[in-house]
Amino acid sequence: MFIDNVELTVHSGKGGQGAVSFRREKFVPKGGPDGGDGGDGGNVYFLVDKNTHTLSHFKGKKVLKAQNGRPGEGRRKHGKKGEDLILIVPPGTQVYDAQSGELIFDLVEDGQKVLFLQGGKGGKGNWHFKSASNQRPTYAQPGLPGKVVQIRLELKLIADVGLVGFPNVGKSTLISTISNAKPEVANYEFTTLTPKLGVVRVSEFESFVMADIPGIIGGASEGKGLGLQFLKHIERTKSLLYMIDMSSYRDPLTQYKTLQKELKNFSEELAKRSFAIALTKIDALQEDEAKEKIEKFIEDLHLNRGGDNRYGLEERYPYFIQDIYAYDSSKPFFVVSISAVARINIDALKYALYDLVKKERSEANSD
Protein backbone atom coordinates (compact mmCIF):
# COMPACT_ATOMS: atom_id res chain seq x y z
CA MET A 1 0.00 0.00 0.00
CA PHE A 2 1.23 3.51 -0.82
CA ILE A 3 1.39 5.82 2.19
CA ASP A 4 2.25 9.45 1.60
CA ASN A 5 1.47 10.90 5.02
CA VAL A 6 2.44 9.42 8.39
CA GLU A 7 2.71 10.73 11.96
CA LEU A 8 5.36 9.46 14.36
CA THR A 9 6.66 10.18 17.84
CA VAL A 10 10.45 10.04 17.73
CA HIS A 11 12.78 9.75 20.74
CA SER A 12 16.52 10.21 20.88
CA GLY A 13 18.27 8.04 23.46
CA LYS A 14 18.72 8.96 27.11
CA GLY A 15 22.28 9.31 28.40
CA GLY A 16 23.58 6.50 30.59
CA GLN A 17 24.01 6.89 34.35
CA GLY A 18 27.52 7.71 35.59
CA ALA A 19 28.94 4.99 37.86
CA VAL A 20 29.73 5.19 41.56
CA SER A 21 32.68 2.88 42.00
CA PHE A 22 35.92 2.69 43.99
CA ARG A 23 39.20 1.14 43.03
CA ARG A 24 39.65 -2.27 44.57
CA GLU A 25 43.12 -3.65 44.77
CA LYS A 26 44.97 -5.93 47.11
CA PHE A 27 46.50 -4.01 49.98
CA VAL A 28 44.53 -0.86 49.03
CA PRO A 29 41.59 -0.96 51.46
CA LYS A 30 40.25 2.44 50.47
CA GLY A 31 40.90 2.97 46.79
CA GLY A 32 39.86 6.20 45.15
CA PRO A 33 36.77 6.72 43.01
CA ASP A 34 36.90 5.18 39.53
CA GLY A 35 33.29 5.26 38.34
CA GLY A 36 33.13 5.69 34.56
CA ASP A 37 30.90 8.04 32.59
CA GLY A 38 27.61 6.89 31.11
CA GLY A 39 27.38 6.52 27.35
CA ASP A 40 25.59 9.15 25.28
CA GLY A 41 22.11 8.32 24.04
CA GLY A 42 21.63 7.46 20.39
CA ASN A 43 20.93 10.22 17.88
CA VAL A 44 18.09 10.28 15.35
CA TYR A 45 18.98 10.81 11.69
CA PHE A 46 17.10 10.99 8.41
CA LEU A 47 18.69 9.26 5.42
CA VAL A 48 17.40 9.73 1.87
CA ASP A 49 17.42 6.59 -0.27
CA LYS A 50 16.44 6.70 -3.95
CA ASN A 51 15.53 3.00 -3.84
CA THR A 52 12.82 3.71 -1.27
CA HIS A 53 9.64 4.93 -2.97
CA THR A 54 7.04 5.10 -0.21
CA LEU A 55 6.58 5.68 3.52
CA SER A 56 4.83 2.34 3.93
CA HIS A 57 7.61 0.88 6.11
CA PHE A 58 6.46 3.25 8.87
CA LYS A 59 2.94 1.80 8.79
CA GLY A 60 1.89 0.67 12.26
CA LYS A 61 4.91 2.27 13.93
CA LYS A 62 3.65 5.12 16.08
CA VAL A 63 6.71 5.45 18.34
CA LEU A 64 10.35 5.07 17.29
CA LYS A 65 13.24 5.30 19.74
CA ALA A 66 17.00 5.50 19.51
CA GLN A 67 18.81 3.36 22.06
CA ASN A 68 19.67 4.70 25.52
CA GLY A 69 23.33 5.03 26.52
CA ARG A 70 24.68 2.30 28.78
CA PRO A 71 25.71 3.14 32.37
CA GLY A 72 29.36 3.68 33.24
CA GLU A 73 31.33 1.00 35.06
CA GLY A 74 34.24 0.73 37.47
CA ARG A 75 37.85 1.37 36.46
CA ARG A 76 36.63 4.47 34.67
CA LYS A 77 35.05 2.33 31.99
CA HIS A 78 32.86 4.44 29.76
CA GLY A 79 29.33 3.20 29.08
CA LYS A 80 28.56 2.25 25.48
CA LYS A 81 26.86 4.88 23.34
CA GLY A 82 23.26 4.10 22.43
CA GLU A 83 22.65 2.92 18.87
CA ASP A 84 21.45 5.66 16.55
CA LEU A 85 18.01 5.54 14.97
CA ILE A 86 18.21 6.09 11.21
CA LEU A 87 14.92 6.86 9.50
CA ILE A 88 15.20 5.93 5.81
CA VAL A 89 12.93 7.98 3.56
CA PRO A 90 12.44 8.40 -0.20
CA PRO A 91 13.53 11.56 -2.03
CA GLY A 92 10.82 14.20 -1.80
CA THR A 93 9.99 13.61 1.87
CA GLN A 94 9.15 16.64 3.97
CA VAL A 95 9.39 16.51 7.76
CA TYR A 96 6.98 18.70 9.75
CA ASP A 97 6.56 19.37 13.45
CA ALA A 98 3.18 17.69 14.01
CA GLN A 99 2.09 20.23 16.61
CA SER A 100 3.22 23.55 15.13
CA GLY A 101 3.06 22.54 11.47
CA GLU A 102 6.54 24.00 10.94
CA LEU A 103 8.60 22.50 8.12
CA ILE A 104 11.77 21.03 9.64
CA PHE A 105 13.44 19.34 6.66
CA ASP A 106 12.87 19.11 2.92
CA LEU A 107 14.72 15.95 1.91
CA VAL A 108 15.40 15.71 -1.80
CA GLU A 109 18.93 14.46 -2.55
CA ASP A 110 19.77 10.76 -2.62
CA GLY A 111 22.28 9.94 0.15
CA GLN A 112 21.43 13.08 2.12
CA LYS A 113 21.83 12.39 5.85
CA VAL A 114 20.72 14.94 8.44
CA LEU A 115 20.86 14.92 12.21
CA PHE A 116 17.39 15.40 13.65
CA LEU A 117 17.66 14.77 17.42
CA GLN A 118 20.82 14.59 19.51
CA GLY A 119 20.92 11.91 22.18
CA GLY A 120 21.18 12.85 25.84
CA LYS A 121 24.68 13.29 27.26
CA GLY A 122 25.95 10.50 29.49
CA GLY A 123 26.31 11.32 33.19
CA LYS A 124 29.76 11.77 34.74
CA GLY A 125 31.13 9.04 36.97
CA ASN A 126 32.08 9.71 40.58
CA TRP A 127 35.79 10.08 39.90
CA HIS A 128 35.04 13.53 38.45
CA PHE A 129 33.83 14.70 41.87
CA LYS A 130 36.87 13.82 43.96
CA SER A 131 38.22 16.85 45.80
CA ALA A 132 40.53 17.69 48.68
CA SER A 133 37.56 17.75 51.02
CA ASN A 134 35.84 14.70 49.55
CA GLN A 135 38.20 11.88 48.67
CA ARG A 136 35.45 9.27 48.28
CA PRO A 137 32.47 10.89 46.54
CA THR A 138 29.38 8.71 46.50
CA TYR A 139 27.67 10.78 43.84
CA ALA A 140 27.59 10.38 40.04
CA GLN A 141 25.55 12.27 37.49
CA PRO A 142 22.45 10.76 35.92
CA GLY A 143 22.37 10.82 32.14
CA LEU A 144 20.52 13.66 30.46
CA PRO A 145 17.15 12.77 28.93
CA GLY A 146 16.76 12.36 25.21
CA LYS A 147 14.48 14.56 23.13
CA VAL A 148 10.95 13.67 22.08
CA VAL A 149 9.26 15.21 19.04
CA GLN A 150 6.02 14.41 17.26
CA ILE A 151 6.54 14.67 13.52
CA ARG A 152 4.57 14.29 10.33
CA LEU A 153 6.25 12.91 7.24
CA GLU A 154 4.80 13.90 3.90
CA LEU A 155 5.99 12.47 0.61
CA LYS A 156 5.84 14.43 -2.60
CA LEU A 157 6.71 12.21 -5.53
CA ILE A 158 9.58 13.37 -7.69
CA ALA A 159 9.14 12.20 -11.24
CA ASP A 160 10.39 13.31 -14.63
CA VAL A 161 6.92 13.16 -16.19
CA GLY A 162 3.59 13.44 -14.43
CA LEU A 163 0.48 12.13 -16.17
CA VAL A 164 -2.45 14.50 -15.72
CA GLY A 165 -6.01 13.79 -16.78
CA PHE A 166 -9.56 13.16 -15.72
CA PRO A 167 -10.36 9.86 -14.00
CA ASN A 168 -10.41 6.84 -16.30
CA VAL A 169 -8.53 8.66 -19.07
CA GLY A 170 -6.09 5.76 -19.47
CA LYS A 171 -3.14 6.85 -17.33
CA SER A 172 -2.81 3.54 -15.49
CA THR A 173 -3.01 1.62 -18.76
CA LEU A 174 -0.33 3.80 -20.34
CA ILE A 175 2.07 3.57 -17.43
CA SER A 176 1.70 -0.21 -17.21
CA THR A 177 2.25 -0.47 -20.98
CA ILE A 178 5.47 1.52 -21.23
CA SER A 179 7.02 1.04 -17.79
CA ASN A 180 7.65 -1.59 -15.14
CA ALA A 181 4.70 -0.44 -13.03
CA LYS A 182 1.77 -2.82 -12.75
CA PRO A 183 -1.15 -0.83 -11.33
CA GLU A 184 -4.57 -2.37 -10.95
CA VAL A 185 -6.70 -1.18 -13.85
CA ALA A 186 -10.49 -1.20 -13.91
CA ASN A 187 -13.05 0.67 -15.97
CA TYR A 188 -14.48 3.14 -13.48
CA GLU A 189 -13.67 6.63 -12.34
CA PHE A 190 -11.00 7.03 -9.67
CA THR A 191 -9.40 3.68 -10.56
CA THR A 192 -6.13 5.15 -9.32
CA LEU A 193 -6.53 6.27 -5.74
CA THR A 194 -2.83 6.62 -4.99
CA PRO A 195 0.02 7.97 -7.13
CA LYS A 196 2.17 5.29 -8.76
CA LEU A 197 5.66 5.46 -10.17
CA GLY A 198 6.92 3.63 -13.21
CA VAL A 199 10.45 3.50 -14.58
CA VAL A 200 10.36 3.82 -18.36
CA ARG A 201 13.35 2.13 -20.00
CA VAL A 202 14.46 3.88 -23.17
CA SER A 203 17.64 1.84 -23.60
CA GLU A 204 19.88 -0.34 -21.44
CA PHE A 205 21.35 2.70 -19.69
CA GLU A 206 18.66 5.34 -20.21
CA SER A 207 15.37 5.71 -18.39
CA PHE A 208 13.00 8.21 -16.84
CA VAL A 209 10.43 8.12 -14.06
CA MET A 210 6.76 8.58 -14.83
CA ALA A 211 4.19 9.34 -12.13
CA ASP A 212 0.64 8.17 -12.61
CA ILE A 213 -1.19 10.87 -10.69
CA PRO A 214 -4.74 9.98 -9.58
CA GLY A 215 -7.44 11.45 -11.79
CA ILE A 216 -8.62 14.91 -10.84
CA ILE A 217 -12.00 16.49 -11.36
CA GLY A 218 -13.16 20.06 -11.77
CA GLY A 219 -12.69 21.79 -8.42
CA ALA A 220 -9.85 19.53 -7.28
CA SER A 221 -7.69 22.50 -6.30
CA GLU A 222 -10.45 23.61 -3.92
CA GLY A 223 -10.52 20.20 -2.25
CA LYS A 224 -13.38 18.53 -4.14
CA GLY A 225 -13.24 14.77 -4.37
CA LEU A 226 -9.78 13.33 -3.88
CA GLY A 227 -8.09 15.99 -5.98
CA LEU A 228 -6.35 18.28 -3.50
CA GLN A 229 -4.84 15.38 -1.60
CA PHE A 230 -3.08 14.20 -4.74
CA LEU A 231 -2.31 17.39 -6.63
CA LYS A 232 0.62 17.98 -4.25
CA HIS A 233 2.37 14.97 -5.77
CA ILE A 234 2.95 16.73 -9.07
CA GLU A 235 4.39 19.90 -7.55
CA ARG A 236 7.92 18.68 -8.18
CA THR A 237 7.34 16.81 -11.42
CA LYS A 238 9.66 18.23 -14.06
CA SER A 239 7.32 17.87 -17.05
CA LEU A 240 3.62 17.18 -17.52
CA LEU A 241 1.78 15.01 -19.99
CA TYR A 242 -1.85 16.07 -20.31
CA MET A 243 -3.98 13.10 -21.31
CA ILE A 244 -7.21 13.86 -23.16
CA ASP A 245 -9.77 11.09 -23.64
CA MET A 246 -10.95 11.24 -27.25
CA SER A 247 -13.72 8.70 -26.57
CA SER A 248 -15.18 10.71 -23.67
CA TYR A 249 -18.45 12.62 -23.63
CA ARG A 250 -16.35 15.59 -22.52
CA ASP A 251 -15.17 17.83 -25.35
CA PRO A 252 -11.35 17.50 -25.77
CA LEU A 253 -10.72 21.25 -25.52
CA THR A 254 -12.93 21.49 -22.41
CA GLN A 255 -10.99 18.65 -20.80
CA TYR A 256 -7.69 20.35 -21.54
CA LYS A 257 -8.76 23.80 -20.31
CA THR A 258 -10.25 22.35 -17.11
CA LEU A 259 -7.03 20.48 -16.33
CA GLN A 260 -4.97 23.60 -16.99
CA LYS A 261 -7.23 25.66 -14.74
CA GLU A 262 -7.00 23.13 -11.89
CA LEU A 263 -3.22 23.09 -12.05
CA LYS A 264 -2.99 26.87 -12.21
CA ASN A 265 -5.34 27.27 -9.24
CA PHE A 266 -3.25 24.83 -7.25
CA SER A 267 0.14 26.23 -8.22
CA GLU A 268 1.09 28.95 -10.70
CA GLU A 269 4.59 27.46 -10.78
CA LEU A 270 3.25 24.03 -11.65
CA ALA A 271 1.23 25.40 -14.54
CA LYS A 272 4.47 26.73 -16.09
CA ARG A 273 6.10 23.29 -16.40
CA SER A 274 7.13 22.00 -19.80
CA PHE A 275 4.25 19.95 -21.15
CA ALA A 276 2.96 17.79 -23.95
CA ILE A 277 -0.47 16.42 -24.85
CA ALA A 278 -1.52 12.84 -25.58
CA LEU A 279 -4.93 12.22 -27.12
CA THR A 280 -5.88 8.82 -25.72
CA LYS A 281 -8.11 5.89 -26.72
CA ILE A 282 -7.87 6.85 -30.37
CA ASP A 283 -8.64 3.23 -31.32
CA ALA A 284 -12.18 3.65 -29.93
CA LEU A 285 -13.05 5.99 -32.84
CA GLN A 286 -13.52 5.41 -36.55
CA GLU A 287 -10.42 6.65 -38.37
CA ASP A 288 -12.22 9.50 -40.18
CA GLU A 289 -13.89 10.66 -36.96
CA ALA A 290 -10.57 10.47 -35.13
CA LYS A 291 -8.78 12.58 -37.78
CA GLU A 292 -11.52 15.21 -37.66
CA LYS A 293 -11.45 15.48 -33.85
CA ILE A 294 -7.63 15.62 -33.74
CA GLU A 295 -7.45 18.32 -36.44
CA LYS A 296 -10.06 20.42 -34.66
CA PHE A 297 -8.24 20.13 -31.32
CA ILE A 298 -4.90 21.18 -32.84
CA GLU A 299 -6.59 24.13 -34.61
CA ASP A 300 -8.39 25.15 -31.38
CA LEU A 301 -4.95 25.44 -29.74
CA HIS A 302 -3.82 27.68 -32.64
CA LEU A 303 -1.09 25.25 -33.63
CA ASN A 304 0.05 24.18 -37.08
CA ARG A 305 -0.23 20.50 -37.89
CA GLY A 306 2.91 18.50 -38.59
CA GLY A 307 6.54 18.91 -37.65
CA ASP A 308 9.67 16.79 -37.77
CA ASN A 309 8.48 13.19 -37.39
CA ARG A 310 11.80 11.95 -35.99
CA TYR A 311 10.07 9.66 -33.48
CA GLY A 312 8.18 7.51 -35.97
CA LEU A 313 4.61 8.71 -35.38
CA GLU A 314 1.90 7.02 -37.45
CA GLU A 315 1.21 9.40 -40.32
CA ARG A 316 -2.46 8.41 -40.62
CA TYR A 317 -3.29 10.55 -37.59
CA PRO A 318 -2.66 14.33 -37.56
CA TYR A 319 -0.10 15.54 -35.03
CA PHE A 320 1.82 18.60 -33.89
CA ILE A 321 5.43 18.36 -32.75
CA GLN A 322 8.15 20.91 -32.07
CA ASP A 323 11.86 20.70 -32.72
CA ILE A 324 13.35 19.97 -29.28
CA TYR A 325 16.31 22.23 -30.11
CA ALA A 326 14.02 25.19 -30.79
CA TYR A 327 11.45 24.41 -28.13
CA ASP A 328 8.88 27.10 -27.29
CA SER A 329 7.76 26.25 -23.74
CA SER A 330 4.59 28.33 -24.06
CA LYS A 331 3.26 25.62 -26.39
CA PRO A 332 3.01 21.86 -25.93
CA PHE A 333 6.12 20.01 -27.06
CA PHE A 334 3.79 17.73 -28.97
CA VAL A 335 0.14 16.82 -29.51
CA VAL A 336 -0.08 13.17 -30.53
CA SER A 337 -2.81 10.54 -30.55
CA ILE A 338 -2.18 7.23 -28.81
CA SER A 339 -3.76 3.96 -27.80
CA ALA A 340 -2.06 2.03 -25.02
CA VAL A 341 -4.25 -1.02 -25.73
CA ALA A 342 -3.59 -1.08 -29.50
CA ARG A 343 -0.03 0.28 -28.98
CA ILE A 344 -0.59 3.15 -31.40
CA ASN A 345 2.31 5.66 -31.17
CA ILE A 346 3.46 4.24 -27.80
CA ASP A 347 7.14 3.91 -28.73
CA ALA A 348 7.10 7.31 -30.44
CA LEU A 349 5.56 8.83 -27.31
CA LYS A 350 8.28 7.25 -25.15
CA TYR A 351 11.14 8.61 -27.25
CA ALA A 352 9.59 12.07 -27.58
CA LEU A 353 9.02 12.29 -23.83
CA TYR A 354 12.61 11.23 -23.20
CA ASP A 355 13.88 14.11 -25.35
CA LEU A 356 11.82 16.49 -23.21
CA VAL A 357 13.14 14.85 -20.03
CA LYS A 358 16.76 15.16 -21.21
CA LYS A 359 16.22 18.83 -21.96
CA GLU A 360 14.78 19.47 -18.47
CA ARG A 361 17.59 17.54 -16.78
CA SER A 362 20.20 19.46 -18.75
CA GLU A 363 18.70 22.81 -17.76
CA ALA A 364 18.43 21.75 -14.10
CA ASN A 365 22.10 20.72 -14.03
CA SER A 366 23.22 24.00 -15.58
CA ASP A 367 21.37 26.15 -12.99
From Swiss-Prot:
InterPro entries: G_OBG, GTP-bd, GTP-bd_Obg/CgtA, GTP1_OBG_dom, GTP1_OBG_dom_sf, OBG_GTPase, P-loop_NTPase. GTP binds at residues 165-172, 190-194, 212-215, 280-283, 339-341. It is found in: Cytoplasm. Residues 1-158 form the Obg domain. It holds the Pfam family MMR_HSR1. It is an enzyme of class 3 (hydrolase). Belongs to the TRAFAC class OBG-HflX-like GTPase superfamily. OBG GTPase family. Monomer. This is GTPase Obg. It comes from Nitratiruptor sp. (strain SB155-2). The gene is obg.
